[in-house]
Amino acid sequence: MKTITAQEHKQILDIRNESLSSLPPGIFEKDLLLTQALRHLASTDSEGMGLVFCGGTCLSKAHRLIERMSEDVDFKLVVPEGLSRTARSKRLSQFKKRVVLVFQEAGFHVPPEQVVARDENSYVAINLLYESRFSPVASLRPEIKVEFNARPPVLPTAPLPIRSMLAELIADRADDFQIECISVDETLAEKVLSFLRRTAEVRAGRNRAEYDDRLVRHLYDVQAIVAHHERLKSEPPHAHFAALVAGDAAQYRNQYPEFELDPVGQMRDVLQALHAQPDGFERDYLQFVDELVFGETVSFAEARSVFSELADQLLGSMHSV
């Protein structure tokens, strides 16, 4: 089963011994293996599929806008146009099998039950199991989750260099590699929508899985994006946000019909709860910051304020779109 090398193990211990970081060794270990999984994907023949890195891990590793551990790897898939529904599903299935094989050949353990596919393979989640050489970290899951969504990016993408937290800390650029990445603007719109729609889904009792108490990460991430790109305060991606909302409404119409009928109302209810019933959100946020943020911390009040202001602008523009 996949594990870090003896040299990597020593480097992680040296970081702790030299007081370069107070983070548990298991966090560096998981990030290192996650980065290696990314490297294998970047060098894989995607057989005509466009592969675009996105999400919080992209913000951390590629755009370098957030200083937190992100243990999920998210990708958008660009499927060739002109395929029939059957051909599209088959093409996505072939890609899924190919990627699983790539991870297995890299040493990760991928049991069949750890591969989930929905919507004719338009959504695929793969859990990569590895052997840890350190004590478990309570805040981390024991697997690396890789998700693929066959919804292409709308805004232009760009290749960016990727490196591990370990390499970043010791200023080692020798093993950098590039991967196509989603834009910051698109990420901002997705994070606002993800927090609002997924929280609203739970409040409506329409969630398939248990509530993800780390959804509050989107508040932290949005604040970090705006801190580095202040233009987004006055120029948020209105049109793109509206397109994303329409896409989610269509994708989840069977699971969450209320969202298709009134997406703005459902999301505004969450914004109101964020201020009127903040206790649960603040508890989750403080725990998230304590366990996974290794850079400068941001208070719940500040993150909520920045997020709410942006979300309010984006939702307000929906009535005129």
Question: Which role fits each region the language model picked out?
Answer:
Residues 1-51, 63-67, 78-321:
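Structured mid-to-C-terminal alpha-helical surface segments
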Residues 53-57:
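Glycine-rich beta-strand-to-loop/alpha-helix junction loops that act as flexible
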Residues 60:
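Nucleotide phosphate-binding site architecture
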